[in-house]
A protein has these predicted regions:
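Active-site beta-strand->loop->alpha-helix modules in alpha/beta enzyme cores, enriched
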Residues: 1-177, 219, 223, 240, ...
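Short beta-alpha junction loops
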Residues: 72-74, 182-187
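Active-site cores that bind ATP or allylic diphosphates and position pyrophosphate for catalysis
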Residues: 183, 190-193, 276, 285
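C-terminal and late-domain segments of enzyme folds
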Residues: 228-292
Length: 292
């Protein structure tokens, strides 16, 4: 086990796919890869509050954390914003909460909707992939990070999966290493799973949050007053990361019902995966035209 108790963090890795397995000491190679996250890192998430759940403690250790919010956090469906009067008002509340939360961790917020004509609404990222990828790639070229950190491809939310896809595309284009963290998904029996990879690779690094890091992370949680009910379902004391898995984005992440399908949202996992496939096909054609 590798630990720095003075900063409120304990790191451990697992040797196999058994979540109950005894933690191994993190190897020099594993920690060297993980250390890349502690320099200048761009964290690509879908919505304000994703970053606190997945990375609220880790970003406190980064030399220069920059968080890119890929959507404005406000869906078109009035169900989500009716208490705020309008979709725009709700989006502004979420933006201000994000600014306050990231100030606690010393991180810089970047709102991708400011860089895309017409913005990107919550639940719409998979429909705006060309615009989002272009804007995000430009930002990353300006920031020049040592690593990218994003959410897993796990079928919890179409925007989470799209943020993962965009990050992987940019990582491949730039050779910047990409790491991922889980938020939530459904198991085959339909039960919810929170902050756990649906398949372990043995490369996971678990961060146990303690002391001052925990105090700050809890303060960040409390900053997101509009998301209190959502955040109550997550554990602030654990964060888990690994190098990005080799996902096939042209297929849905799991063959069973995805979380947002069980929520009966308007999009399906097949539709989202098709959007990824269409984007990859279009960029391949564009590359061939440029080489011709």
């Amino acid at each position: 086990m590798v630990a720095d108790a003075s900063k409120g963090f304990t790191f451990q890795t697992y040797a196999d796919d058994d979540p109950a397995a005894k933690p191994d000491v993190a190897s020099d190679t594993e920690m060297a890869g993980f250390d890349a996250l502690l320099g200048t890192t761009v964290i690509v998430v879908a919505h304000p509050d994703d970053e606190v759940i997945g990375f609220g403690a880790l970003m406190q250790q980064m030399r220069k954390p920059v968080v890119v919010f890929a959507t404005d956090g406000a869906p078109h469906d009035p169900y989500f914003w009716k208490d705020y009067g309008s979709r725009d008002a709700y989006a502004e509340v979420r933006r201000q909460e994000a600014r306050a939360a990231l100030a606690i961790a010393g991180a810089e917020p970047v709102f991708l909707s400011d860089h895309v004509a017409g913005g990107i609404a919550d639940q719409e990222l998979f429909r705006r992939l060309p615009q989002a990828a272009e804007a995000c790639a430009k930002l990353i070229s300006e920031i020049r990070p040592q690593a990218l950190l994003t959410l897993s491809y796990e079928g919890g939310h179409p925007d989470h999966d799209s943020a993962c896809f965009v990050s992987v595309v940019i990582g491949r284009q730039t050779a910047i290493p990409v790491w991922e963290a889980p938020l939530y998904h459904r198991d085959p029996d339909g039960k919810g799973a929170v902050q756990k990879f649906h398949q372990r690779s043995g490369e996971e690094v678990e961060l146990k949050v303690e002391a001052e890091a925990m105090r700050k992370k809890v303060e960040m949680f409390h900053t997101y007053k509009s998301q209190n009910l959502v955040l109550d379902g997550f554990r602030p004391e654990i964060e888990t990361f690994r190098p990005m898995a080799n996902y096939d984005f042209t297929r849905r992440p799991m063959p069973w019902k995805l979380n947002y399908e069980l929520w009966q949202w308007k999009m399906s996992g097949d539709e989202v995966a098709q959007a990824f496939a269409d984007y990859l096909h279009s960029t391949e054609l564009s590359g061939e035209e440029q080489r011709a």
